Regions:
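Acidic, low-complexity intrinsically disordered tails
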Residues: 235-272
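Residue-level signal for inorganic ion chemistry
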Residues: 73, 132, 184
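Beta-strand segments within the central parallel beta-sheet cores of soluble alpha/beta enzyme folds
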Residues: 4-7, 191-192, 276
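Extended, non-catalytic structural segments that build the interaction scaffolds
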Residues: 55-69, 111-130
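Core structural elements
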Residues: 104, 130-145
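Catalytic adenosine-cofactor/nucleotide-binding cores of aminoacyl-tRNA synthetases and other
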Residues: 9-103, 194-232
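Acidic, turn-prone loop/beta-hairpin segments
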Residues: 89-117, 143-245
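Phosphate-backbone binding interfaces of nucleic-acid-interacting proteins
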Residues: 263, 268-331
């Protein structure tokens, strides 16, 4: 028998539960279509600790996409590949010079897999993602500290520039390997821009800094996470959700009216009977003429036959149907 059972928490909306009757259920297909399944999955696992309740809002989702995926990850990839393309035509030279700014970034990148593994083993997915994005943040700060645009002004500093870009690309590769369980489609796009071979996408390769060849070829590609205009997007989502809520309320209206209508028993009202067609009235009278129904079992054989006793009264053309109805009622 299992010794531990893990369960996820509740996903709340504005502090309350979601329900179809309220018409406030968040449509995951709509969000995945607008922002990608990778972005939605990242947000849910990054913001909501496993096993705890989480409060969802469109604003939180958009802010997380803009801050982490657009500003940090997407910006780091775009800057790295764009500078490699601009200064070296995408092909980093073999001759490279290290600098004092390298040590801190390389230390963080080399120890990332062990920290990530410990968090994943503890089901602390939000911490594992935080570890990865801490290194991504350090890489963005590394760009500011080394100022590649300044190094590019002198031919003498080109080897140093090449090393800076290599360190950025290799750091990105390690982070991307570890992000694969969360954002598989996005990671393949990043690998393509970094020109990473199959052996550079493995779990083992994330523990070593230097898997990319020194003369790596980088490809400037599409912006994997364009920044979202939050105000405009929130207004559009509000309109879409209002339409969905109205549709849900309209769909529930007939059922609610049916529940509120009192159930009728006994004979039909005089008004209903007067309005009914002759054949329907005859059948109604025939049903009410049934005073007694008894199941009679014929003996003498294994076969059993049901007979129905009733008082006369039904119209001849309704007799069979009334008998069947009486039989059903007896059962």
């Amino acid at each position: 028998l299992p010794k531990h059972v893990y369960g996820h928490g509740w996903l709340l909306l504005d502090g309350g539960k979601m329900s179809k009757s309220k018409g406030n259920v968040v449509d995951p297909y709509l969000l995945a279509e607008r922002y990608s399944a990778d972005a939605l999955r990242y947000f849910l696992l990054r913001d909501f600790p496993f096993g705890s309740d989480g409060n969802f809002s469109n604003e939180l989702l958009i802010n997380r996409i803009n801050m982490d995926l657009a500003n940090d990850l997407g910006n780091l990839l775009s800057r790295t590949t764009a500078m490699a393309d601009k200064y070296f035509g995408g092909n980093l030279p073999i001759e490279q010079d290290e600098g004092p700014e390298d040590a801190a970034l390389l230390e963080k990148a080399r120890g990332l897999r062990d920290r990530y593994e410990a968090d994943m083993e503890a089901y602390a997915f939000q911490n594992a993602l935080a570890d990865v994005f801490e290194v991504i943040d350090n890489a963005n700060k590394y760009i500011d500290a080394t100022a590649p645009w300044v190094l590019a002004k002198s031919e003498d500093s080109k080897p140093r520039l090449a090393r800076v870009l290599y360190n950025l690309a290799e750091t990105l590769r390690i982070c991307t390997v570890l992000l694969q369980p969360f954002m598989p489609t996005t990671c393949e796009k990043i690998f393509a821009q970094l020109n990473v071979e199959a052996d550079g996408k493995t779990w083992d390769s994330a523990a070593a800094f230097g898997t990319l060849p020194a003369n790596a070829t980088l490809h400037k590609g599409e912006n994997i996470f364009p920044r979202i205009d939050a105000a405009k997007e929130l207004a559009e989502l509000e309109a879409l959700e209002a339409a969905q809520k109205a549709a849900a309320q309209a769909a529930n209206a007939p059922a609610e009216e049916k529940e509120e209508k009192p159930a009728e028993s006994g004979a039909a009202s005089a008004e209903q009977e007067a309005a009914a067609p002759d054949r329907v009235r005859r059948r109604a009278r025939a049903l009410h003429s049934v005073r007694h129904c008894q199941v009679v079992r014929a003996g003498g054989s294994d076969r059993q036959e049901d007979r129905h006793r009733r008082q006369p009264g039904p119209a001849p053309d309704d007799e069979g149907q009334v008998c069947q109805r009486g039989h059903d009622l007896c059962r």
